[in-house]
Amino acid sequence: MPEQDLASGFLLRFQNARPVCLSVGSFVSFRTVQPRKMRDRGWRCVWHRMAGVGALFGIFGVLCTVEAGATVAAPQVETGPLLSVRAPRSPLHLRDVDAPEVTHASSEGSPQFESSLSQQRLRRPADRGEAHNGEEPRKDAATQTVRGYGGQSTEPPPASIVPVSSEAPQDGAEQRQASSAAESLAGLDPDAGDTGLRSQEMDEEGSGAAQDMERAHAAQPTVSTWDDAHLVQVSTSHPDMFPVDGSFSKKQEGRRERRLAVRGDDSFARGHNRDRDASNGRSILRRAPGWAKIAALATGLLVSAFGYSSYKHGGPRVALRIHKLHLKRKLPISWRRYLNNLPVLDERLFPEFEDILPWLRRGARLVKRVPHVSEALADFIGLDEETRRTGIVIKVKSSTDAEARRLVYEVNAHANMVPDNPFFLPIIGAYQGASKRAVYMILPRARADVADYVRARPYDVDVRLAAAEMVYSNYILHTHGFLHRDIKAHNYFVTFDGHVVLADFEGVGVLQQRTPVVGTRGYFAPELSRATDHTEKSDVFALGQTLKRLVKYMRPTVRVPHLRELWALTKRMTAKDPEERPTLKQVMEDPYFDGIDFERLEAKDQGVPFRGDFSIDDPDAGGKMYIPPSKEQDHEQENE
């Protein structure tokens, strides 16, 4: 059928092209993940290579699946009753070989052969005497009459019956024997005079061989070999199979797909075992069960996906940590779905949002402090008595043409990633506006950020205790496997009890995670100017810069205790070489913090770093809205 011909041709071409596909896939995969930056030196290169190996597994799994489908679609060889092939007038005395029913193999335009059934049958040696009826056989071997089991005679085409194996190649002895047989068949002389005598001798020997084979098959289980070797009928005029001089060239003898097999009964079984043991990957794949192919494909895809994830995130440990967060639902797989699951807040129902809506344009980010919350909004978001008294902060992000991840990443970081600790600013709630124009975060209000508080009330600040709480909050974040990546004085806030809390988790990331560089100019570590990732040492550098700015914000008339030790510590923390910077654990053990017990710091019983009742907000019901400055304005403020 045309469909079967198409499937057979596709399978043959695919099997020949598979090594090329694997070679090209190997080269592309390894070149794609080859390190191109100085940051990729060291152990990360191993996981770059792992991504390539995983890609190879994936490619091989896909190829195996396609080949398996093509094998199923290819025409199946049906085997009929075992018949005996008789080579007339051969100068080499050969034993009879069992063969199934065969058909003419198409040799025009392609060396590919078809193995479907034909209507012509070869007769067995036991039927020859009855078929001839005492007559001499014809001298023309090409037009000799062949009788089947039913006694019906047919005229075979001018062709030679040659057993061909599609699996493992023969050894040298079998090839020489097959070549000699082919030469004898190709060099027949139709005009020889001893045709009758030779035919009669071969009839007798063939009958004895057939009886021996029947007894052998009855004594031991029959081994079916027609899955690995089958017979095809090839035209003697084919230039590749039968050269003009009647002999096979060395190239033709060594060709795997055209191996000749002339065996007896027991040698036939031994040849089947040799073919089975020496089978290549294609035969193993065809004999493999379906579940094994599916498992190989799934394994390849999993290894490829994990290799790519390790390369993307910066290593296998980071990839496993991120996938673990996915499984624990602390890191959403779909940010759009996470955004759509946020509760809806109707801005028209609450007076706190009246002056926010006019500012909602593309890319707008607003922060509004609300010292006095209306009863309607307090009941809607479920505020407790203390928060109703101190007020809230509404952080607004415009959703016009904005990515879902940028809108809700900080929401998820506050809710799921940041540990529950008194030195972190908690989140009250997150909502999407009914107008679909913004996402709102509700946070508890603080007195001010550290920078503004130190500028306004420098005499009410205990610098060493404030620095200790700032270092400890960052240390807790690192111990839970996260980086802040935007440490600065404006991201530390002073609560109403006078202690420090860390906020603004929009840039928080997993330790050693490969992500774009974020932060504020003036706090960037020197290594971030190159193609590298955030590390714990980059947060240490930013924290050292923050402590330096904290001292600079103090007025010149204010005396700072232990200033010499503080400058020595900040100098170590801001070293250009990341290897020379201390870890946060070493920072807490520095002589500057002698007398501070970090294990009891969470109890907040060692003093208050920010004394007084200073608040940056005006005590009006509407609150004061703060629009964050641009990066250029923020940089100018930091350099003042």
UniProtKB/Swiss-Prot annotation:
**Which residues are tagged with the site Cleavage?**
260-261
| Signal peptide extent | 1-70
Recorded phenotype for the gene knockout or disruption: In C57BL/6 mice infected with knockout tachyzoites (type II strain Prugniaud), the number of cysts formed in the brain is severely reduced compared to infection with wild type tachyzoites. Parasite virulence is not affected. In vitro, the ability to differentiate to cyst stages is normal. In BALB/c mice infected with knockout tachyzoites (type I strain RH), virulence is not affected. At the tachyzoite stage, loss of the intravacuolar network (IVN) tubules which appear to be replaced with large multilamellar vesicles.
Question: Changing residue 258 to A does what?
Answer: Loss of proteolytic cleavage by ASP5
BP terms from Gene Ontology: intracellular signal transduction
**Outcome of mutating residue 361 to A:** Severe loss of catalytic activity
Family matches, as Gene3D superfamilies: Transferase(Phosphotransferase) domain 1
Mark out the compositionally biased spans (Basic and acidic residues): 124-141, 248-279, 631-640
Per UniProt, subcellular location reads as: Cytoplasmic granule; Secreted; Parasitophorous vacuole lumen
Q: What is its main location?
A: cytoplasm
Biased composition (Polar residues) is annotated at 104-120
Compositional bias, Low complexity, is annotated for 175-186
Reported effect of changing residue 486 to S?
Loss of catalytic activity. At the tachyzoite stage, loss of the intravacuolar network (IVN) tubules which appear to be replaced with large multilamellar vesicles
Q: Which residues form the Protein kinase domain?
A: 291-593
- Catalytic activity of the protein: L-seryl-[protein] + ATP = O-phospho-L-seryl-[protein] + ADP + H(+); L-threonyl-[protein] + ATP = O-phospho-L-threonyl-[protein] + ADP + H(+)
Q: Which residues form the active site?
A: 486
EC number per UniProt? 2.7.11.1
Main EC class the enzyme belongs to: transferase
User: Which cofactors does this gene product need?
Assistant: Mg(2+)
Give me the Gene Ontology terms describing cellular component: extracellular region
Explain the purpose of this protein: Serine/threonine-protein kinase which, at the tachyzoite stage, phosphorylates several parasitophorous vacuole (PV)-resident proteins such as GRA2, GRA6 and GRA7. By phosphorylating GRA2 and GRA6, regulates the formation of a functional intravacuolar network (IVN); IVN is composed of membranous tubules that bud from the PV membrane into the vacuolar lumen. Plays a role in the establishement of chronic infection in the host by controlling cyst formation in the host tissues.
Family according to the record: Belongs to the protein kinase superfamily. STE Ser/Thr protein kinase family. WNG subfamily.
Q: What is this protein called?
A: Serine/threonine-protein kinase WNG1
